[in-house]
């Protein structure tokens, strides 16, 4: 049939290319498509090469020549990433994704001076690598998710591995490294976790390989277009046996969890980074995360218990303050740390002097953290209210509007609590 496959070859992924496929593309570019070794012809496909892929006239000519083809055909076009804008041509990796900028100079309109989890991760891992050659950072085509710009990748050397845009391969590689005594850390955007599900379950967790997966932008405050949403990783990762999925609320908690995860050899571990601005309170973290599923009561009260997971722990504290102001009730506030398990002892203890437990999570409710708490109390008189997002696809959304529509503002939450106290 008339199947036309367009290969837009700009000699780049997001960063530089990795993998055997690109070697053949390079050979074809260098020979103007004439190399005898041709992956596409080996598959039985017809093939034509367009050397000036940014030239509209050449493209029209190429497509006219194949539009009536009776066999599947590959149109391999050699293009320049960032073509037509000098700053983008000169720094292709940085310009793959960019914020608002001055078109005359390419300089950003807004200087980002705040610390972020990408740089925090990179600085920690580079220091760890220098002390321990077993530590390996892994990315799947998005090296700057962990802060590894080109210069930092060179500094890390062989202890940094980019498998290309192949998240499945990254997890399988991490499992293999961990099984053989290495200490792999795979950084991935939450939105791409669905690509890894089979490997997390089959390669990583069945083998109980002690690798670390750090998920970035898993939050309503993360990327906000429909194909890049970080709202669904909790139901995916929190329900795979053997996996320990953690939710830090601060920089200090994250680094403590990361250090524990790298050094332990009992569990595959995921760490879901908070959304929004980095919170750093300078608090020394002495918790043993190997003592699984032990939550922390950060404020002791009665009647109402607020369990705020990850990003929404801060919202939980605000809810407790608002509840005190409106009703005079001192609520208990809990940092659960663990997404994958419940602290049955603590939850049982709450029955003695609490009537309502609320859960807050930065993601969809269906299959999420709050439902685990609700299930625990299912045969008791405890009222459980789960707050989070409904199951839907969002696109180019306003965070404040989404939170309000889902009844996840401190005022709305307190209104709901007041119905039961």
Go through each PLM region and give its residues.
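Extended, hydrophobic alpha-helical segments in both membrane/secreted and soluble proteins
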Residues: 1, 160, 169-177, 182-187, ...
């Amino acid at each position: 049939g008339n199947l036309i496959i367009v290969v837009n070859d700009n000699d780049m992924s997001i960063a530089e290319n990795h993998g055997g496929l690109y070697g053949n593309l390079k050979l074809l570019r260098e020979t103007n498509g004439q190399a005898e070794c041709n992956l596409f012809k080996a598959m039985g496909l017809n093939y034509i090469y367009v050397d000036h892929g940014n030239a509209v006239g050449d493209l029209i000519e190429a497509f006219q020549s194949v539009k009536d083809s009776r066999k599947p055909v590959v149109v391999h076009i050699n293009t320049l990433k960032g073509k037509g804008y000098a700053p983008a041509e000169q720094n292709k990796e940085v310009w793959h994704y960019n914020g608002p900028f001055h078109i005359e100079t390419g300089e950003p309109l807004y200087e980002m001076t705040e610390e972020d989890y990408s740089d925090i991760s990179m600085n920690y891992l580079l220091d760890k690598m220098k002390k321990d050659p077993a530590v390996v950072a892994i990315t799947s085509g998005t090296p700057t998710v962990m802060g590894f710009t080109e210069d930092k990748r060179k500094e890390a050397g062989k202890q940094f591995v980019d498998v290309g845009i192949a998240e499945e391969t990254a997890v399988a590689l991490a499992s293999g490294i961990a099984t053989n005594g290495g200490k792999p850390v795979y950084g991935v955007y939450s939105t791409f976790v669905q690509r890894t599900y089979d490997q997390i379950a089959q390669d990583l967790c069945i083998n109980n390989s002690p690798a670390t997966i750090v998920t970035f932008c898993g939050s309503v405050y993360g990327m906000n277009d429909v194909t890049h949403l970080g709202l669904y990783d909790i139901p995916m990762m929190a329900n795979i046996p053997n996996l320990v999925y953690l939710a830090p609320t601060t920089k200090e908690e994250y680094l403590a969890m990361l250090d524990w995860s790298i050094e332990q050899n009992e569990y595959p571990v995921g760490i879901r980074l908070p959304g929004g601005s980095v919170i750093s309170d300078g608090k020394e973290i002495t918790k043993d995360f190997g003592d699984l599923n032990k939550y922390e009561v950060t404020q002791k009260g009665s009647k109402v218990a607020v369990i705020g997971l990850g990003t929404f722990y801060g919202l939980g504290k605000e809810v407790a303050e608002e509840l005190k102001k409106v009703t005079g009730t001192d609520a208990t506030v809990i940092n659960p740390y663990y997404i994958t398990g419940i602290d049955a002892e603590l939850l049982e203890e709450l029955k003695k002097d609490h009537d309502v437990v609320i859960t807050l999570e930065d993601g969809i409710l269906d299959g999420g953290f709050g439902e685990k708490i609700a299930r625990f109390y299912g045969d008791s008189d405890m009222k459980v209210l789960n707050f989070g997002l409904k199951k839907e696809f969002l696109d180019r959304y306003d965070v404040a509007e989404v939170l309000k529509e889902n009844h996840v503002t401190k005022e709305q939450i307190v209104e709901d609590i007041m119905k039961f106290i």
